[in-house]
Amino acid sequence: GYEEIFKSNDITHYEIIATSAFRDTTNSEEARRYIETAIHHPLRIISGLEEAKLIGFHPQASAGKTKLFVDLGGGSTEFYFRQREEIEIRSFQLGAVRNMLKKDEIEEWKRLEAWLLSIKPVRKLTGIGGNIKSFLESQNATSLKIKDFNERAGQLSQLTTKKKILTYQFSPDRADVIDDALK
């Protein structure tokens, strides 16, 4: 399990956290206790803003002048915007699973749009998280221009879930939601 991996990499201090799915469920406390018992380690449920703040630990977050990072999860999307020494973090209740289930709220999309229009335009957006990592790996790329990204995401969306699993070795859960994550 995770403990062996941590030991083999000399990791002695760690924290296990839960994000949007735990924040939004009605039985989060019961689920948290169940998991803690199963893994013999505390599990902390963090806020969306705390989740966004963690993006600051990304190796590229402190380099350069203006940076915008986005972490699109299943239930929420976090942004970390850095302009010189000024940092803004935001969390929106917009995620791949919410999108797939048509549970995104139009007001939340409007909040996101207003915030994006309020910040300095950026030339490069850095996506982090499982969906973008899986997508880029499937394209044998580490970055894409927006035109290429949209074109390749469109091509991927034409494949069935089964074909995505067979062609790109996506897990069933990833293959099921990746199109909604890339929209």
Predicted regions and their residues:
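Helical "lid/coupling" subdomains associated with nucleotide-phosphate turnover
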Residues: 1-11, 19-66, 81-183
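Conserved catalytic-loop position in the HRD/HxD motif
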Residues: 71
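Acidic, divalent-metal-coordinating active-site segment for phosphoryl/phosphodiester hydrolysis
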Residues: 75-81
